[in-house]
Amino acid sequence: MKRKAGTVCTALGIALLLAALSLFGYNEWQSARAGQAASAALEEIAHLWATPETADSAMAPDVMPAVEVDGQTYVGTLSFPTLNLELPVMAGWDYDKLQSAPCRYSGSLATADLVIAGHNYTRHFGRLDTLQPGDEVIFTTMNGLQHHYTVALVETLAATDLADMTAGEYPLSLFTCNYSGQARVTVRCEASDDL
């Protein structure tokens, strides 16, 4: 009887290990696919930068200049020099778009309350929690203007704490879910004096 229980436990352990490895493999595949999609969009964006003449200066404060690439609308790029990472940023967000690139969640540059959401893929926002206060973050608009920020705070918020996420106390906030999905890793950035 003990031998049979041991065999069942061993088989169950192997099955759980295989399930975990399968999940890890699937997540890595998704991360690689997302990284490729972001790289392809960055390449296209580099060729499609809107010139200052084509950017509408009479836009509402919450509207940002945008370009369309392969049916998706982008408002800029984010660069993280300390992470050696550059990503395109989509104009609006939904869960499908997050599979390809970080997305503007709310706010804008003009109103100094831009919030960007990204998936926790390694090739997207998966390393946000490694940023340190003082690290540089650069947002480049579709008309080529660079906005420099420094990380002021890295915090963890509850997944349901949308009021704090969008409170507008920082000109740039970036967030992603943690690996359990129960909380949001949030990076708060201040405008940099070193322009």
List the predicted regions and their residue ranges.
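Solvent-exposed, non-transmembrane regions of membrane-associated and secreted proteins
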Residues: 4-195
